[in-house]
Amino acid sequence: PREILEMPPYGCVNVHASLLPKYRGAAPIQWAVIEGEKVSGVTTMRMDEGLDTGDMIMKEEVVLDPKETGGSLFEKLSRIGAALCVKTLAAIEAGTAVYTPQDHSQATKVGLIHKQFGLIDWKKPAREIECLIRGLNPWPSAYTKLHGKTLKIWDADVADGDSQKEAGAVAEVTRDAVFVQTGEGLLKLKEVQLEGKRRMACDAFLRGYSLKDTDQLGE
């Protein structure tokens, strides 16, 4: 309520883990990775009655690594956010803070991520699936089904080529990797975790599990 927000002499300040007005709402860190963003960051703002709609005070950007995960970006933005909060409060106290209204026409909103969101749709392009895997690492994790059991996929790369097989089909099995056909291109699985087992590199997984190029993921 407005009366609560107006109680403190300097108003209320919030730290949001995105470059507002993009990614308002819940789980902005994971969504930035899932959406394949190259840059993310932290914004401090003066709170108003909307959801992440208040005037911006300070921003700091960070360039995402090609293999950035939701977990690694969380760690980066946590450190940046803590320092930016201190700087913001100091500027407010000194009377030097600048309040910049958000361009609401450029706003994007994201929602909560639930465990079921991690179920991989193999009809999607390999690049989208690879981003999903990174964004949901470590929680709730991306997963598929293999012979009726849950198979979590912790790390994967987009691979060259196309097997022309059905989406989700195992296209090739090598000594240390599994190549899966997607709706667009191949995905190379590098680290997996079968239901009831520990997380392991694909070469270790293949030493204990017989996977053939006639198998289908998602079943």
Spans of model-derived segments:
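Donor/substrate-binding cores of folate-linked one-carbon enzymes
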Residues: 1-109, 114-116
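Generic detector of leucine side chains in alpha-helical contexts
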Residues: 5, 19-20, 51, 64, ...
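A residue-level structural signature of the nucleotidyltransferase/glycosyltransferase Rossmann-like core
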Residues: 12, 54-57, 121, 150, ...
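N-terminal start-of-chain detector that recognizes signal peptides
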Residues: 16-18, 29-31, 91-94, 114-117, ...
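Alpha-helix N-cap/helix-start motif
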Residues: 22-26, 122, 198
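An anion-binding loop in the catalytic cleft
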Residues: 123-219
